[in-house]
């Protein structure tokens, strides 16, 4: 999608502090972190707009994303635990309509 900020990051049009990339997903540090470690993990293709749109055909992609999240948590020193958050729709706080997962670790603030 031309106006999607995450699609622009994947294409390299917008810089990011990338921590992981493969054929399916990309992970990078959030520009406004809500925790000491705050990484976004996104599918590289804009095929899903939110968690509400996830269908059975996307099960392998979602499984891959969670595998990447676990790998990143280990690499980023989150042995003490971490949170994985996805917001589904504007009322839940989703501001970028491209499926993404927040990996949050370290001392966390409020859940809001």
Residue positions per predicted region:
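HIT superfamily nucleotide-processing domains
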Residues: 1-112
């Amino acid at each position: 999608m031309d106006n999607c900020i995450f699609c622009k990051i994947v294409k390299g049009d917008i810089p990011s502090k990338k921590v992981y990339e493969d054929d399916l997903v990309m992970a990078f540090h959030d520009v406004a972190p809500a925790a000491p470690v705050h990484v976004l993990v996104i599918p590289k293709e804009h095929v899903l707009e939110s968690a509400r749109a996830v269908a059975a055909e996307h099960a392998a992609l979602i499984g891959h994303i969670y595998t990447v999240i676990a790998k990143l948590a280990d690499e980023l020193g989150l042995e003490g635990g971490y949170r994985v958050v996805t917001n589904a729709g504007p009322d839940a706080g989703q501001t970028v309509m491209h499926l993404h997962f927040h990996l949050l670790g370290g001392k966390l603030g409020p859940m809001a």
